[in-house]
């Protein structure tokens, strides 16, 4: 896959700014990245937009006559609307006509569609959404999972999240020896609720996971950890809070910049620094979160995503494809399962 152009199915009808901003981001990706884009949605609306702009050669339109609204119950909507844009996009991956799906639409519907149409990877009990956060160390990020796929989790789910996050950190983020932390209320192994205590024991005992201990909330962006695992309830709160902090910081900086001629001159001098700051803390720069654990590359973007965020989401999908994240997770699970089977057979024969 790394040697050919990735084919990305984009849910053109999903999101607050669909379809125009979604299409704009997809067009940019088709021009700047080594990808072919399949725009899935109302063909008349998509063609109308493209007629006002030049139609790039690496874009194909796939008609979908239905849309799942944000206020619909996801599972029933997915089953009722088989021709919804997110379902059609997932079917393209299932049929090997696309390598990944990107959607800024109903996140619950995207997860339900992925599970029903693509299924889970062998050895994975629950999917997880992984989000990349900036840290105080320039050029270094941390991936946090789960940030919303599961409100309730079990220790073995978090153990699987840690494994998938480790693989992503190593092969996509380029961290040779990732450090995995468990989000908790204290550094000590005796801290936390029942889920945290039991998960700690599993992570500590798993030699395939480079677990270094508990991570407190203040540690998430410290750069001391490369992977943070938590349940989806806590992770989603953390994600939304981090997004809000970034927006507040940018707004405060805008308000505090001096006014007048001298202020304009100072702002001009600071412009490169301010641009880099925005790139580091703006969630749109990361594009979305990878849905780990399903048998296909799925990127779930923020509902408020505009063209830059969609571009980055497509780039995120491309990175996951080129670095064979799914294949590496599957290979590990198969190896682990075989080792467990061999161990069981050895014990049985000795008895």
From Swiss-Prot:
Q: What does this protein do?
A: Catalyzes the reversible formation of acyl-phosphate (acyl-PO(4)) from acyl-[acyl-carrier-protein] (acyl-ACP). This enzyme utilizes acyl-ACP as fatty acyl donor, but not acyl-CoA.
| Catalyses which reaction(s) | a fatty acyl-[ACP] + phosphate = an acyl phosphate + holo-[ACP]
| CC per GO annotation | cytoplasm
One protein family per Pfam: FA_synthesis
What does the UniProt entry say about where the protein is found? Cytoplasm
Task: List its EC numbers.
Answer: 2.3.1.274
The gene for this chain is plsX
Its recorded name reads: Phosphate acyltransferase
Query: Which superkingdom?
Result: Bacteria
Q: In which pathway does it act?
A: Lipid metabolism; phospholipid metabolism
Q: Main location per UniProt? A: cytoplasm
From the broadest rank down, the organism's phylogenetic lineage runs: Bacteria, Bacillati, Cyanobacteriota, Cyanophyceae, Oscillatoriophycideae
One BP term from GO: phospholipid biosynthetic process
Look up keyword Lipid biosynthesis and say if it applies: yes
According to the record's subunit comment, the protein's assembly and interactions are: Homodimer. Probably interacts with PlsY.
Family membership? Belongs to the PlsX family.
Print the keywords alphabetically. Cytoplasm, Lipid biosynthesis, Lipid metabolism, Phospholipid biosynthesis, Phospholipid metabolism, Transferase
| Molecular functions per Gene Ontology | phosphate:acyl-[acyl carrier protein] acyltransferase activity
* InterPro entries attached to this UniProt entry: FA_synthesis, Phospholipid_synth_PlsX-like
């Amino acid at each position: 896959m790394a040697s050919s152009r990735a084919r990305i199915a984009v849910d053109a009808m999903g999101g607050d700014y669909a379809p125009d901003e979604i299409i704009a981001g997809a067009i940019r990706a088709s021009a700047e990245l080594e990808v072919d884009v399949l725009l899935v949605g109302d063909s008349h609306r998509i063609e109308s937009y493209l007629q006002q702009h030049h139609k790039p050669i690496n874009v194909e339109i796939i008609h979908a006559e239905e849309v799942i609204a944000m206020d619909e119950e996801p599972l029933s909507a997915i089953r009722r609307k088989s021709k919804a844009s997110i379902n059609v996009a997932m079917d393209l991956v299932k049929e090997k006509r696309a390598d990944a799906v990107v959607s800024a639409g109903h996140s619950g519907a995207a997860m339900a569609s992925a599970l029903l149409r693509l299924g889970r990877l062998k050895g994975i009990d629950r999917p997880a959404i992984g989000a990349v956060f900036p840290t105080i160390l320039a050029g270094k990020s941390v991936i946090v999972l789960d940030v919303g796929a599961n409100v309730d989790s079990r220790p073995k789910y978090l153990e699987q999240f840690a494994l998938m996050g480790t693989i992503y950190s190593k092969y996509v983020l380029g961290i040779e020896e990732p450090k995995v932390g468990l989000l908790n209320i204290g550094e000590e192994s005796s801290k936390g609720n029942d889920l945290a205590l039991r998960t700690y024991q599993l992570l500590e005992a798993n030699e395939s996971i480079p677990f270094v201990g508990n991570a407190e909330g203040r540690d998430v962006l410290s750069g001391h950890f490369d992977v943070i695992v938590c349940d989806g309830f806590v992770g989603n709160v953390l994600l939304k809070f981090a997004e809000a902090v970034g927006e507040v910081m940018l707004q405060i900086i805008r308000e505090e910049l001096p006014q007048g001629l001298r202020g304009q001159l100072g702002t001009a001098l600071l412009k490169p620094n301010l641009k880099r700051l925005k790139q580091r803390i703006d969630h749109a720069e990361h594009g979305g979160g990878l849905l780990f654990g399903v048998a296909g590359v799925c990127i779930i973007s923020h509902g408020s995503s505009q063209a830059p965020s969609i571009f980055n989401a497509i780039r995120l999908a491309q990175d996951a494809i080129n670095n064979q994240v799914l294949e590496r997770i599957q290979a590990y699970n198969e190896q682990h399962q075989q080792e467990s089977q061999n161990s069981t057979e050895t014990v049985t024969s000795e008895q």
